[in-house]
Regions:
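Short helices/loops that flank or line small-molecule/ion binding pockets
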Residues: 109-121, 136-139, 167-169, 188-191, ...
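Secondary-structure end/capping motifs
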Residues: 74, 261-337
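Extracytoplasmic "Venus flytrap"
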Residues: 53, 57-85
């Protein structure tokens, strides 16, 4: 397990118990550990969804079984989720020799990382920050694809609270640790030169609205979907990553090297599936938006704002996405948040 004896903090119904600063040493631990709010901490307690039969989970060590982990809701979204929903994934992978496909849902990237390290997953769909941090620790993963890039993060304030970054001095700001929103917040605070003047605490996105309503936090750095939704509910937006070069996120698909050693042609086959799914969801955008809204429980007009389909990549490594990913990696390394540097070209799987 990737865990350290550190107080990461959590939020009770009435107040924060966390006393975490934004010092780089603490943030490094935040980025490499899982959450501690009674959420899922390892693959042993994640929700496994088998496209064939629950009994096949026991056969997860078989080469004929593909174990996919993802961060998010009851079902994956984006090209992976669409490929699953439309039957593209099942059809093509069965032809490739996979008899069983299992899906495990995780609340955040660090928890998914733990499952990859433990050998409980073959493939992971997650954000750039946890994926980079894991690779920088020397874990043997390979980058298969950038599925989405320029994903916006938002900094939303409580009502009747601060309206500018300067007004956040001396305040508590929350975000979901180890996420692309976390990296955005760290970069934003560094740009504004107020990193030492605020307290950053961990809070899952599912608890953000209630915490803002109670006034437990002055602001919350949140995801592309939740940001516009909170704005529609009257919460002021202080900032978004769209206002800053290099602070938006990318979504990645990685695989373990041990799995790829057994399935060397998997990157090409899997990327072909996701490319087909990406093109199909764009060609059927209204149907996809309805699916995405159903899964995330946000109104469809919010989804259309939060997810311009131009962010969905039709190729494995789009140039714009690679540039953004390189910038994120450099930031994490320069701040000591990623343990070591590496070349993206070395990380990328060869097709």
């Amino acid at each position: 397990m990737l865990s350290f004896p550190i107080e990461t903090g959590s939020i009770s119904k009435n107040k924060f118990t966390a006393k975490l600063s934004t010092s780089m040493a603490c943030v490094l631990l935040l980025l490499t550990t899982g959450c501690s709010q009674g959420e899922t901490k390892s693959a042993q307690s994640v929700e496994a969804i088998n496209t064939k039969s629950a009994s096949t989970v026991a056969a997860s060590n078989s080469v004929s079984t593909l174990r996919i982990g993802y961060v998010g809701n009851s079902e994956p979204t984006g090209p992976l989720g669409w490929a699953k929903k439309k039957g593209i994934l099942d059809r093509e992978l069965q032809q490739a020799g996979f008899k069983n496909i299992t899906f495990a849902r995780f609340p955040n990237g660090p928890d998914l990382n733990e499952a990859l390290v433990a050998g409980q997953l073959d493939v992971g769909s997650l954000g750039d920050t946890p994926a980079i941090v894991l690779r920088a620790r020397g874990q043997e993963t390979r980058l298969l694809r950038i599925t989405q890039f320029n994903t916006t993060a938002w900094l939303v304030a409580k009502k009747n609270g601060p309206r500018s970054l300067a007004e956040l001095k001396g305040q508590k700001i929350a975000t979901q640790k180890g996420s692309y929103m976390h990296r955005y917040l760290l970069g934003l605070l560094a740009e504004a030169k107020i990193a030492k003047d605020v307290k950053v605490v961990h809070l899952m996105t599912t608890e953000a609205k209630a915490a803002l309503e109670r006034g437990d936090v002055a602001a919350y750095a949140t995801s592309s979907d939740l940001g516009p939704f909170l704005k529609s509910q009257g919460f002021p937006v202080i900032d978004s990553s769209a206002n800053h070069k290099g602070l938006s996120g990318t979504s990645l698909v990685v695989a373990t090297e041990s799995f790829l050693a057994k399935q060397p042609d998997f990157p090409q086959k899997f990327n072909a599936i996701l490319t087909e799914a990406a093109k199909d969801l764009k060609a059927n955008s209204e149907e996809y938006y309805q699916y995405h809204a159903q899964i995330t429980k946000y109104p469809i007009d919010i989804i259309k704002v939060s997810l311009p389909l131009k962010q969905i990549s039709e190729e494995p490594l789009p140039a714009e996405g690679v540039k953004l990913l390189e910038g994120t990696k450099k930031f994490l390394v320069s701040q000591g948040l990623a343990k070591s540097d590496f070349k993206l070209t070395d990380w990328a799987a060869k097709e």
